[in-house]
Amino acid sequence: MWRRVTSVSHLFSHSKSTKFNQGASTFKIWETFTSESEIPTPSKGSPFVTFVLGGPGSGKGTQCAKIVEAFGFTHVSAGDLLRREIASGSAYGSVILSTIREGKIVPSQVTVELIQKEMESSDNYKFLIDGFPRSEENRKAFEQTIGAEPDVVLFFDCPEQEMVKRVLNRNQGRVDDNIDTIKKRLEIFDELNWPVINYYSQRGKLHKINAVGTVDEIFEKVRPIFAPLSK
């Protein structure tokens, strides 16, 4: 089902954030509908992939847990995969840690390889890919490696002030949860994620969710998107 990626350790030496000449406000977000006709019919012979996008603190991880419970998806968090590799104490993980501390994006093929391995190890065929892709480079690497586009893309739209407050309050002991790094992460998100959001909006795959409110209030906006799917 999946194509193996080759060794990617050499990519770290050239890792740096890409700068776009146009800011986030330049990109028009095309509103999409959440009718049943827009949800592709999943096939157990191939993966049904949903990308879950949103800035740090937008609540996408929390909503993924609700989607998993209601619709039987497997949650694949790009951030959790990277942190798990860091916790392993491997040399690979040490370089990932340095990259995150500098507020940079981990090389695309590194994250794609970790995601691919996680999907290959699952018996499920429905996946929520949380926090990826974070850039056009990420998007292209995933689609070229996996050989397919996502079926659905969720974007949790949340004001920056609210995201900062949430990240500071959650106190998870993460290496990337200090105020300076949060600001770097938000800046990188604004510069790199909007082209991805715009791309999938124009492809008719994007569902933009207002991520302000209680967990249950936000999930009620998500639920209709996946209503045609059963566990």
Curated annotation (Swiss-Prot):
It catalyses: CMP + ATP = CDP + ADP; dCMP + ATP = dCDP + ADP; UMP + ATP = UDP + ADP. ATP binds at G57, S58, G59, K60, G61, T62, R170, G213. Residues 77-106 are annotated as: NMP. CMP binds at N138. Signal peptide: none annotated. Coiled coil: none annotated. Its EC number is 2.7.4.14. It is found in: Cytoplasm; Nucleus. InterPro entries: Adenylat/UMP-CMP_kin, Adenylat_kinase_CS, P-loop_NTPase, UMP_CMP_kinase. It comes from the Eukaryota. GO terms for biological process: 'de novo' pyrimidine nucleobase biosynthetic process; pyrimidine nucleotide biosynthetic process. It is an enzyme of class 2 (transferase). Residues 169-177 are annotated as: LID. One of its GO terms (molecular function) is dCMP kinase activity. PANTHER family: NUCLEOTIDE KINASE. Belongs to the adenylate kinase family. UMP-CMP kinase subfamily. Catalyzes the phosphorylation of pyrimidine nucleoside monophosphates at the expense of ATP. Plays an important role in de novo pyrimidine nucleotide biosynthesis. Has preference for UMP and CMP as phosphate acceptors. Consists of three domains, a large central CORE domain and two small peripheral domains, NMPbind and LID, which undergo movements during catalysis. The LID domain closes over the site of phosphoryl transfer upon ATP binding. Assembling and dissambling the active center during each catalytic cycle provides an effective means to prevent ATP hydrolysis. NCBIfam families: UMP_CMP_kin_fam. This is UMP-CMP kinase. It comes from Prunus armeniaca (Apricot).
